């Protein structure tokens, strides 16, 4: 490959440079272009004129520099780069002219490099270009010159003082700048930058050699470079809060500073610049020292005032005493407020006192107020003289009202402490009686507390369970003291005791009689107690022994109690109150399980090791609670309830507690009109399904009555059901094969029960005016019914007359012989037999009933019990009157029809 000694320039470019003249090119004509812009005729402001003058001066400097400079030399920053740059850039100069190209002018590689070496620039545009031989000679001279400078620097021949080095540095920097022809857009951008730099330099006061700015005073933020800001003074103070992240950022910052120092030789800085940097470094060191001092300073909480601890040390043994003393002082203050209100209590201001005490619960500890209230009431009631009933009743009403307003905890705590106080005084009094201290006057404290508990029971504070437990204590050991207590409770709460649990009252009376017989002598007070118990059993208490009524006071408190929630009496027993330490607080849910653990687990105590150890025992607990509850869905499917609506109705009726519960469940189903029509058939089906084992159940008749009251059109459905039953009992065969097949599977006993239940059910509907007597128009009384049909009609009339007679019965006062007189009114029976019966059916129905009552109706066969029984005699009396009255009413109606 042939080696070339120089750079080959294309001939096309050389020909273009030789032939073309760029002196008249508008792109390089600066002054003329400016003159044309000035000649546009636009009016310039003073500020714009000054800008134009500064631009003209700058252009003159540039133009003189282009003309006077014969060549531009580049002095590289490093010696090695300067030696290589002279060889590389020789070929870019050809015939003393620079090629002008838009691509080359915009290239960073050709025009922005620091290593560009240019040849001589023609001073005049008309000068002739150099030949190829002259160009090669020029390049060789430049190479020799560059090698000579490099060798001199390496051998140490270039020496001089600081002034000479500075002069050389300035000369080299001037030679670095290469002036090329600029486009108008670049020239205008350059002018704008120069104008901006001169403007800001003037504002900052930078003139001549003064190239650094300093703060004039402490308020000069720009000159001081924001030295006065606290953020920059305390910067880095909280680096420790960020842990390793802060150390990483500090190390990165140091690396950046080190890298900047390493490349500082590339920048041409003057001596003044180094002096300024020294000053800045000193100030930086001072600021770092100040920041270190601030960093060691302790942090204070700005939200807490500085205080000095003057409290003395309190040993742990005395701290609890201090807390107790503080609690006692608080409790004493609350007690004063509560007692002040309790001492003012009366009938007239009871609502005001209750309101004041209720407000104390909002501002003071609830438990302290409850304790003070209970203690205050017991101190007032526990007096050794008998207090008035109205006085004690006010305090019972106060405790009841506050318990209802403030919750069950207030009432439970009050009842607990009251019963404990009563038992304490009762045991003391019984001990005195056992010691034969009869001469001593008995205390009235127990009587007053028993009166308080009785009124609490009257207000609905506690249930009858607690009162019965207390009465059983008195009955177990009858004497003068217990007799007086028992009479006191009966006089206040006798009527409620009898109404809540009559069987328990009967048991208590029998136990009292049994214990009284064992006594050698019965005191007059004990005999009076037994007579009073007998009167209470018979509901004949004398008004003279009754205590003050509580109903007016309870009515007066309704204005306060309307805003409170519903209240159920406390279902607490005397056993729960006695065993509160072992079983826990009885008013809390689940607290009583703690005392009943011995019933589920066997616990053995190891006395040899003096430690209790529980033996692990396998206990099989069978939860048979759910086994007793039938699965009504399965039963409904077994009873052929083949739709969801029928199953829902069946379950609602069969799973209800009573007929009202069944009615509410049916209402919740929200049945449509067509769906409601399913209810009568399902009610009758349930009646027949239940009759096989339980006999007749009046519950289904009550459900039918309640449903017909709500949906009156259902009476028509029951009427059609009645006619379907009658058709079964006619002599001719019935069309429905399914029902006959079902009845064929039943034995004679089940058939009789089925007929009996149907007859009594429809008899009840007739007696309650659900069905009218007009339904008998399709009943063939004379010769059209079989034996089962005759039996069905007998039972129907039996139930009809029995129910009507019961409603028509009126009891009068006793006569002179002591017997009660009972009379009957035939108005209701007349309405049943004649009302709502169409005239065309009246004759047929009445004649058929008259014949059936005279020939077939034998009510004695259906009476339950034996002659002489109270129920038997009552039913016989009612049926005898009803049958006789029905005959007379029918005869009168037939006479009226015939006439």
From Swiss-Prot:
Residues 24-33, 134-143, 162-174, 251-264 have a biased composition (Basic and acidic residues). Keywords: Nucleus, Phosphoprotein. Residues 24-181, 248-326 are annotated as: Disordered. Residues 65-77 have a biased composition (Polar residues). GO terms for molecular function: RNA binding. Signal peptide: none annotated. Coiled coil: none annotated. Residues 103-126, 265-292 have a biased composition (Acidic residues). InterPro entries: ARM-type_fold, CWC22_splicing_factor, Initiation_fac_eIF4g_MI, MIF4G-like_typ-3. Residues 335-540 form the MIF4G domain. The modification Phosphoserine is found at residue 736. GO terms for cellular component: FAL1-SGD1 complex; nucleolus; nucleus; small-subunit processome. Residues 644-781 form the MI domain. One of its GO terms (biological process) is hyperosmotic response. It is found in: Nucleus, Nucleolus. Belongs to the CWC22 family. Interacts with PLC1. PANTHER family: CELL CYCLE CONTROL PROTEIN CWF22-RELATED (PTHR18034), NUCLEOLAR MIF4G DOMAIN-CONTAINING PROTEIN 1 (PTHR18034:SF4). This is Suppressor of glycerol defect protein 1.
